[in-house]
Amino acid sequence: MNLWQQNYDPAGNIWLSSLIASLPILFFFFALIKLKLKGYVAASWTVVIALAVALLFYKMPVDHALASVVYGFFYGLWPIAWIIIAAVFVYKISVKTGQFDIIRSSILSITPDQRLQMLIVGFCFGAFLEGAAGFGAPVAITAALLVGLGFNPLYAAGLCLIVNTAPVAFGAMGIPILVAGQVTGLDSFEIGQMVGRQLPFLTIIVLFWIMAIMDGWRGVKETWPAVMVAGGSFAIAQYLSSNFIGPELPDIISSLVSLVCLTLFLKRWQPVRIFRFGDMGASQVDQTLARTRYTTGQIVRAWSPFLFLTATVTLWSVPPFKALFAPGGALYDWVINVPVPYLDKLVARMPPVVHEATAYAAVYKFDWFSATGTAILFAALLSIVWLKMKPSAAIQTFGSTLKELALPIYSIGMVLAFAFISNYSGLSSTLALALAHTGSAFTFFSPFLGWLGVFLTGSDTSSNALFASLQATAAQQIGVSDVLMVAANTTGGVTGKMISPQSIAIACAAVGLVGKESDLFRFTVKHSLIFTCMVGVITTLQAYVLTWMIP
């Protein structure tokens, strides 16, 4: 079959081409913000519009276009949706076996204040899970935990998405940084160092921001010591580990340092006023729970599903385990690779997005054993045995999990179908090239490219795979550091995570807000844009004023 070459400027004018390319994204924003459509409806129509743009404007062959949609949809089911199914199942086991009341009580014994619970669960525990697993699992698990602690579901999901900004760049054992190094040929250690000189500023701002969203200026004034302990210890550990150890461990190290510092600090200090959301009858439940005293053994047993989850996910993420399933590894036969018909190596990515014309691979990987979701399922099975849950109850719980998640899973599939048609048609690259045409102002717009990549794909890793080499090329054209621009793609990407349709579908699924995706999108969108502008300002200062900060 003939190789179809991507054309990034079909209109002959990059601004006009990018306007047409942005139609599906503009529709998606409009559908959620103004029309208030349900997530799966908005995603389905977005795929239809993206297909129309790919076929009519980019002249993509019909078979390639349809193949990319199907490939994206299946990628949404596995590995993405599989992670959510397993994560929600672990949470439900904890609730069904009655252990969740003890977890709640143990957190309440550290602090009954929901602003500080947000720091412990949403920030510290969430950052740890991001470092180990990434790909949506942290938001699903922490948001569900917070709803169990009496948080309003919309706030739990929205706040977890926003606070997840801090750890995303080093998520899943530093994969976004390692991928950026692979696609650009730059040293991933240096990219990690640069990200570690941008993100710590954002981390502390984000935590104060979260306090302000929850409880206004009063909340900031009352909680600033705890925020400085949690955010300050995290930021310092993030800087040191990324600059002196490497990009794999900053999240794991920083989150553990922050969790220990914050817990010890809260043993000595509590805010003058205890803040709780005044709804869902949460406070009545909590008084009785807080009065119940549990032994250390009971508390450890109650947390066991999440301890198992932490252990299995960490094991699955370590390089020796991953190497078993890599080409040439002892268990490589366990990974099923299927080249996507009508698509694999039939589309060519062209300069300036890549250095030379490159056939775009499309291989569907069914890693039934080495997927993160399977690691979480193992944690669920260990929990069932350890907590002596009846097999019939466990099967029923798994069934109800699947039933509840059916629509969100469809949404995630459609969102990834849109991401893949955008990538294979060249639509996403047109938008990227338009941003790269902004000349010396590109240092400010560079993070928006990462933001766009994560919005489209739901992953900082995928955003770097798409746009990191373009960032490096643009940097050389305007005479600034390529390491800085590639790092800005990664750091800007983290701010897009909170509005990425994939993240929103996952968060809504975890807290039972299916069909309310538009509410969650409206909750996070302004914060996302403000943070991206902040990263743009930091990057521009580092490019032209604070050049000594570049490694």
From Swiss-Prot:
Entry function: Uptake of L-lactate across the membrane. Can also transport D-lactate and glycolate. Seems to be driven by a proton motive force.
Location (main, coarse): membrane
Recorded topology in the membrane: Multi-pass membrane protein
UniProt cross-references to Pfam families, sorted A to Z: Lactate_perm
The keyword tRNA processing is annotated on this UniProt entry: no
Lineage of the species this protein comes from: Bacteria, Pseudomonadati, Pseudomonadota, Gammaproteobacteria, Enterobacterales
Catalyses which reaction(s): (S)-lactate(in) + H(+)(in) = (S)-lactate(out) + H(+)(out); (R)-lactate(in) + H(+)(in) = (R)-lactate(out) + H(+)(out); glycolate(in) + H(+)(in) = glycolate(out) + H(+)(out)
Protein name: L-lactate permease
Keyword Magnesium: no
Keywords: Cell inner membrane, Cell membrane, Membrane, Symport, Transmembrane, Transmembrane helix, Transport
Organism of this sequence: Salmonella typhimurium (strain LT2 / SGSC1412 / ATCC 700720)
Ranges annotated as spanning the membrane: 13-33, 37-57, 69-89, 131-151, 159-179, 194-214, 244-264, 306-326, 366-386, 405-425, 438-458, 530-550
Assigned protein family: Belongs to the lactate permease family.
MF annotations from Gene Ontology: lactate transmembrane transporter activity; solute:proton symporter activity
